[in-house]
Amino acid sequence: GLGSDSSGIMILLEDAPIGMPLKEYLGVNDVVFELEITPNRPDCLSHIGIARELGAYYNKEVNYPSTEINGETGEKTEDNIKVEIENSNLSKRYVARIIKNVTVKESPAWLKERVESIGIRSINNIVDASNFVMMEMNQPNHTFDFDKIAAGKISVRSAKENEKLVTLDEEERELTTDDIVISDT
């Protein structure tokens, strides 16, 4: 990708061939569609949703990604972490899954390019994979560091009066009681 700073001049390496198209020099070989989805079609707010719609329009079968879980350990997630939905009007379902032996690091180039092409800032391999799956399946999700989850519990609840949080972009945001919070406290 081109990065998020578009405020100035892009400095290329000295060996950049003069006259070569920028997309060729950068190795950008992708098409990005900008779609306007009407409010009555939230099913089209994901890659799979758009694929289904195009498949129906062109009478083509959609190849869905596998949702099979590999590497079962026999250890049950619910034995290690509890999920509590404080009000089922907020969320009908929230599930947890523990994945062990993961190293947080910079995303590989292909993943960075994919998340940035859909307007999401690359953060690291874990957050980027989570965000990409969210956009692929239109399924909100979040990743937690298991070792940092307080009391082994995740709660789905309404925000508290005057509750604040610091988001991944290091901005402090004030919540309202209408906001849904996924919390370990």
Can you annotate each of these PLM segments?
Residues 1-185:
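RNA/tRNA-interacting regions in translation and RNA-turnover enzymes
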